[in-house]
Structures are given as structure tokens and as C-alpha cells.
A protein has these predicted regions:
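Alpha-helical interface subdomain recognition
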Residues: 1-80, 87, 100-105, 112-117, ...
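A short, Trp-centered hydrophobic/proline-enriched beta-strand micro-motif
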Residues: 116-124, 168
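Flexible, small-/acidic-enriched active-site or ligand-binding loops
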Residues: 135, 190-219
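A short core secondary-structure module
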Residues: 146, 150-194
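Long, acidic (Asp/Glu-rich), low-complexity accessory segments flanking structured domains
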Residues: 211-233
Length: 379
């Protein structure tokens, strides 16, 4: 990605924000299982949310790589829960509104997302519908000037804090892909209920929740795009999500290398620093080599995205490759810590548990391989 002086100044500013506003409190947030709501306002005040939103909708009109950098830097600092939260707002929901929303919707929601006044979540997954989105059961039936919504969603990132829910629902239960639409649901509407915070093996500070919709009346004006085109919109916007996940993976790899390097330079075994042992050197060299390859792949796809040329297959290959590398490299680096790597007080343990879900959300890596194979084999 291009790095000019303005970009570097923006990145340095964000690094200072992480050091001053996040690092001293992150352990407590992980313990509490929730990032505080006021952090969103501080992110907004400092210009770190939805930075690529055009100025006419309250944003800064920055290039996309500014926004992606924020996700990478957050993950690299070891704050993966926050990276997922920011990514959900800036890399998932914001592009949907920018690219599909009506002028009224964009003018109403986007400025509040930029300031952090509104936190957003996208609700696709259900208990019986993960990779197979066509199997969702949540229904939104049109009645005069509103949709009546009934159903439930699970594994929803930012679910507890969400003020706006981008809901994927069946508007035609008899149809398959063409029966899916997307609604903008104000979380304050009657019938919207937020369930428990789900307990995960990683990403402890990232609020992940169940959402329930009981006869929720959503104005028809809050449908996003055309009725029945929801599945097509999802396919259209998924590349940005997968690119964001890949940026997070890259950041995690780079961050894990740094803390491991620092550890092996200090730690001694058998009378010498771990850094002098061949296995240690080879593990770190292998991690660095794979990080360089991952960086090149990410940069290529990010450049293609900015040129509106990134294909579904290309970003599927990237997401699969780099998250596999992330999990593999961090596992090998943790081994260099010995028993200390298994202790929560050592940051490498958090990098390890936070990495595992990267191969699952945003489309499982098995689905990514199927996408690549379909293009390769022609079916």
C-alpha cells in the first residue's frame, strides 16, 4: 500500500492513541468481556472510524488503505478484539451503506458512525445457517409501509453495543437466494432484544451476542437496496470484509514476531540466549519469510481493491492463505516461549487464541478453497 508523509503521520497518531487510550486498560476489558462504549466516542473524536466515508456524509474522504491500516495496526499491537470491533463498523457496515444505501440513509447513519455516536453490527449468521446463508430463517414480511421481522441471529460482533443492525432476512420465504433482503434495523425498536454475551476461547473483549426479533416493525424506507437482492449485495461486499480480515491477520503475524524476538533475545537456556539456538533462529526466520510473502499478497489485493478490480476468487485465496499462515506462525512462535507461552500473562497466548477464529468467520477457509477451485475447474 502507498505510504506518503500524510499516511505516516496518521498512522503515528493512531499508534499514540493505542498506547495512551487502549494499552493501559485492555487487560481489564478482556477480563470484563467488553470494550467500553465511550471508547467508540473517543475513536470518533480522533478521526479513527469510517475514515473513507466521503465528506458529504460527515467523513474524511480518505483512501481505503487508511481505513485498512487501522485494523492492521490494532491487531499488530495485540488488541484483536478492538480490531474486530472497528472492522465491523468501518470495513463491513460502512461500505454497505456507502455503496447500496439511499441518500437519506447515508445522510442519516454515516455521520453518526464516523463520530462513534452509532455503533453498528451486521447480522447474517443463525444457529442453523452459517456458511449456507440461503438457509436463514429470519423473516421480514412486507405489510403496507413496513416489514414485520421475526427470527434470531447468533455470533454477532458488536451485538451488545449495536445501535444499528444491518439485518439479513428472508422477504420471500419460498425463494432461495432471490428471497433475501437487507434491512437497517434501529436497535431501539420494540421487539429487538439482545441476548447474552457469548463466551469465546479468544477475542474476550469483543462483544459477541445473540439477537432476537419479535414482531419488529421496520419502516420499508429502511430496506437497504432492492428487495430480493440481498444475497447479491452480500457477495458484492464480502471482498472488503475478507480484505479486512487479511489485514488483521498480517498485523497479528507482525506483532507476534516482535514480541517473540524480544523474548528470545532476553531469555536464556543452557547458558546462552535462546536467540543463539539454531531452532529459534530458524523458527523466527521462517516466520519472517512468511510475513513478507503475506505482506506482498495483501498489498497486491489492497491495490486491486482500490482500483475496483479485486475479484471474489482473489480475495478468497488471500483470506485462506494468510489466516492459515497466521495460525501456523503464531503456534510455532508460542512454542519458543515454552510453558510461559501457555500463560495468559504473556501476550503471545492472546495472539494464539485470538487467531483461531480467523479461519472461520468471513467465510470458512473451506469455503474459500471451494471458491478458488470453482474458478480453477470451471464448475
Amino acid at each position: 500500500m502507498p505510504h506518503d508523509t500524510e499516511f505516516e503521520l496518521f498512522r503515528d497518531s493512531y499508534r499514540r492513541f493505542l498506547k495512551e487510550q487502549v494499552a493501559p486498560y485492555y487487560e481489564q476489558w478482556e477480563h470484563d468481556g467488553l470494550i467500553p462504549r465511550d471508547l467508540w466516542l473517543r475513536l470518533g473524536e480522533n478521526g479513527f472510524l469510517c475514515v473513507d466515508v466521503p465528506e458529504e456524509y460527515g467523513g474524511y474522504g480518505a483512501p481505503v488503505h487508511y481505513s485498512l491500516m487501522l485494523v492492521q495496526e490494532t491487531a499488530q499491537a495485540g488488541f484483536a478484539s478492538l480490531a474486530v470491533a472497528i472492522g465491523g463498523q468501518s470495513e463491513l457496515v460502512s461500505p454497505y451503506l456507502q455503496n447500496i444505501g439511499s441518500e437519506e440513509q447515508k445522510h442519516y447513519w454515516l455521520p453518526k458512525m464516523v463520530t462513534g455516536e452509532v455503533v453498528t453490527a451486521i447480522a447474517m449468521t443463525e444457529a442453523n445457517a452459517g456458511s449456507d446463508l440461503q438457509a436463514i430463517r429470519t423473516q421480514a414480511i412486507l405489510e403496507n409501509d413496513h416489514y414485520r421481522v421475526n427470527g434470531s441471529k447468533t455470533f454477532i460482533s458488536n451485538g451488545l453495543h449495536a445501535d444499528l443492525i444491518v439485518l439479513v432476512a428472508k422477504t420471500d420465504p419460498q425463494a432461495k437466494a432471490k428471497g433475501i433482503s437487507i434491512l437497517l434495523v434501529d436497535a431501539a425498536l420494540d421487539g429487538v432484544k439482545k441476548g447474552r454475551s457469548l463466551q469465546k476461547i479468544g477475542l474476550h473483549a469483543q462483544d459477541t451476542a445473540e439477537l432476537f426479533f419479535d414482531d419488529v416493525c421496520v419502516p420499508a424506507t429502511q430496506r437497504l437496496g432492492e428487495e430480493g437482492q440481498g444475497f447479491a449485495y452480500l457477495m458484492q461486499e464480502l471482498p472488503r470484509e475478507r480484505l479486512s480480515i487479511s489485514m488483521m491477520a498480517l498485523g497479528s503475524i507482525l506483532g507476534a514476531i516482535v514480541i517473540t524476538k524480544d523474548y528470545v533475545l532476553e531469555r536464556k537456556a543452557f547458558g546462552q540466549p535462546l536467540s543463539q539456538m539454531q531452532n529459534t533462529r530458524f523458527v523466527l526466520a521462517n516466520a519472517q519469510i512468511k510475513a513478507k510473502a503475506a505482506q506482498a499478497f495483501v498489498d497486491q489485493c489492497a491495490a486491486l481493491y482500490q482500483q475496483h478490480q479485486l475479484s471474489v476468487t482473489q480475495v478468497a485465496a488471500l483470506k485462506c492463505f494468510i489466516t492459515d499462515v497466521q495460525c501456523e506462525v503464531i503456534d510455532q512462535l508460542l512454542q519458543l516461549f515454552g510453558g510461559y507461552g501457555y500463560m495468559q500473562e504473556y501476550p503471545i497466548s492472546r495472539f494464539f487464541v485470538d487467531a483461531r477464529v480467523q479461519k472461520i468467520y468471513g467465510g470458512t477457509n473451506e469455503i474459500m478453497k471451494e471458491i478458488v477451485a470453482r474458478e480453477l475447474l470451471g464448475k
